[in-house]
Amino acid sequence: MSKKVAVIMGSDSDFPVFAPAINRLKSFGIPMEVRVMSAHRTPDAAAEFSKTAKDNGFGVIIAGAGKAAHLAGVLAAHTTLPVIGIPVKSSTLDGLDALLSTVQMPSGIPVATVAIDGADNAAILACQMLALSDEGLAAQLAQMKEDMVQGVAKKNAALQEKVKEL
């Protein structure tokens, strides 16, 4: 069985953004814990969670927030586990502020950052990391990619039929 994935959001209002990640992890059978923590309002709890995550069976941390989105970086500062950051779009600057806060990390404290509101890709990336030591998960990911190839081929075939009808 794969290690757990921590899914940490800065506010409960971020849940709709994180739902695709939770659903994707469930679809791959990945055990997870979903929590709300704040880099600014609960910094000690965030640091403690991150410091103990590896010992508690986690293999990857997915974290995100909006505005001054320091959550992923704070978690990354306190662990050697991979941290995947999700910048969350808020009313301020359409998420650009969160993107820059998440991606612009100092040397030595990396955060693998996905697109603004890119929770599904965050979950897929977490699965790819875990699949390095889980052949069953690697096979599931390969099947997902093959399904995408087949889906595009079907769409292309349908498009070619529409073009012929013009």
Regions found by a protein language model. Name each.
Residues 130-166:
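Glycine-rich phosphate/pyrophosphate-binding loop and the adjoining helix
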Residues 22, 47-50, 77, 94-106:
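Active-site-proximal loop->helix
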Residues 14-18, 42-46, 65-74, 93-96, ...:
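Short glycine/serine/threonine-rich phosphate/pyrophosphate-binding segments
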Residues 34-55:
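N-terminal beta-loop-helix "entrance" segment that forms/cooperates
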Residues 92-139:
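Short, glycine-/small-residue-rich phosphate/pyrophosphate-handling segment
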